[in-house]
Amino acid sequence: MLKVHSDRSLYFEQQYINTKKYIVSFVDEAYKLNPGMEVLEIGCGEGGVLKAFIDAGMTGVGVDLHTYKFDLAVQFLDEYIKDGRITLINKDIYSPELQKQFNERFDLIILKDTLEHIFDQEKLIGYLRGFLKDNGMMFLAFPPWNMPFGGHQQMCSSKFLSYMPYYHLLPTSLYKILLKAFKEDKQLIEELLDIKQTQISLQRYKRIVKEKGFRTVREQLYFIIPNYEIKFNMKPRRLNKFIGTIPYLRDFVTTTIYSLIQKQKVTNT
């Protein structure tokens, strides 16, 4: 397991630095972030991503079901919570209370490394559309399932498994046998098998975006993910544009997609 996955304060700082340097500018260049705008992050974890957007002048809400990560966010974002710039909520995003409270409220919604963990991604993206103001934006970043570490195997305690690419593409039965053979924790194995079920490809994501009433405003595919700059001192590299046009093949060499999509008005015909 990489140290960043066990040291949550380090993970928080790395998320903050990466978001401030790469993601805030990615959004701001296409959708000007102004003081008074409100942002919602789904699966906010420890809050490093959300903090970067608040430092850009926004106010925000972070929602996470994971109690341990939520408690860390409360600790790490204490000053922001006290001065009213951030509200943290430890609830299911589908709760009727939040649905009413969040209706057409936000200028921007963020799902950073969250979508690939969600069952029924079509339902979630369509549901979150109702939380956006007219012409509001949603930023999503996720690793396509077929990329070298699309199974999140870097979380494995075995150094060999954490650095070995593509084996998450094995049939489920063989994948499970391999994880057990290296004595991975039962809870981690269950989490990795869940990710195998919730896998998402670039093709399916693009279809969902269109079907759920959004248009793509900006998109960037990365060969070397920006996170690796601070983790491994590797400079980010964008995916070759030609390879990026080839369906299926691009999923095997795209480490992450940055996607900014806009809510479209529904027209009655």
Regions found by a protein language model. Name each.
Residues 1-104, 108, 252-269:
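Conserved N-terminal segment of class I S-adenosyl-L-methionine
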Residues 11, 97, 120, 161-162:
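Poly-acidic low-complexity segments
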Residues 51, 72, 120-121, 149-151:
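Short glycine-/acidic-enriched loop or helix-start segments at secondary-structure transitions
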Residues 111-112:
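A short beta-strand submotif of the Rossmann-like class I SAM-dependent methyltransferase core
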Residues 117:
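Histidine-centered divalent metal-coordination motifs
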Residues 122-130, 137-262:
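S-adenosyl-L-methionine-dependent methyltransferase catalytic module, highlighting the catalytic core
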